[in-house]
Amino acid sequence: MDITRRHLLSLAAAAAATAPIRLAGARLPKPQFAVHPFVEANPKAVFLKRTNVPHKMDEAAKLREGLAFARDVFVPMESAGIPVTHRVILKPNFTSVRNERPNEENWGTGTDPQFYEGIILGLKELGLKRFHFLEANNFHSWNYRGLADINDRHGVEMNEPDRRERNFRDGFEMSWTKVPDPVVYTRIPHYAPVNEPDTWLLNIAKWKAHGMCMTLSTKNVQGLVVKPYVRFCPGWKMVTGAPAFMQPDIHGKVEDRVNRYFENHRRLGYARYESSANLSPMNQEIWAHKTCDNSQVINPGLNIIEGIYGRDGDGFGVGQDHLTNLVMFGKDRFRLDMIGMYLGGHEPGNVNLFRIAKERGMLDTFNPWEVPVYEWVAGQPVRRKLSDFTRTPMKTYYLQKDGEPEYHLVNEPFDYDRVKA
């Protein structure tokens, strides 16, 4: 990250601003910690916490919100929790870009850095000391928004994302997991220490549009998969056309299984299956199946969507940030993403991922109105209606229709009762 006098002054202000919070709210560490018991007891619910950040570049305010979130949602425990000696795996959305625009205009491409740092501070208060950051993509850009500097400040170990073919044979710094009910991948490699004993995973996604409609908490954990297995989006060329060393880990009847699902969805008349978009309906279908394969073998302790400011566009250099002052979280990332998708102006029933997840037994509904919603107020959950929250249109280029603007909402009415019947 480019260090300027302005940036140094803002960091000093942020540190000063959090000092009184640390003294007023800090908790004595105990041998274990846990997610708030109400969240644990309601795994099918989604929780929304309003934040108070006046401007997306207000570092002090964002740091305070991250720390306040951690203090609200993670609690010290004497027993029946997660030992503080565990390794905590942090998975923010690290996407960062630089193009012809000022850096501030690209700030919404990934999880906010100061919110991320505030969460780390809150976890350290609980006595946690062993942190790992893992990411497959865009190593060159990890510090564009100062995220690598944050990891260095707090002793967070960062992985080396690139691997050679022999590393897959040797299992070098990766953990392999067999998929119980596969469609595409029968085995998936993740960067160590994912799925190793004595680890706990925290998923901190961004609220933003993407070619898969929106990239939220379910897609965020895709970045834990070792390259090139992580390439879920290119369709058949990373399935039947994947490198030879990957082929033993791809289902022997993948074409039959994917095509059978696809043709059934066309027959049922789901929206946008006639789109001629480059990220085609089949690309979306394969991405959803790979995502469901991965979801069977990844189990975060908590999933978060940071929406202090959201972003429309393509997920990278095209798009605008919108100050939305909202953080969403929950145990079930499909349900969490349904709410994030709906509040982003889209209708979840029109998106392949949720329908396929239900067909494959990972969801019991993809109707956002059937998800219990709570607002987190002063450290406590308060039951709300989904309509109590403002929708912010996050336009995407997902499966553009003929005559439709390139960036649009996927908001066609969907008859959930017909599908349920």
Q: Which sequence ranges carry the predicted segments?
A:
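N-terminal and secondary-structure boundary signal
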Residues: 2-421
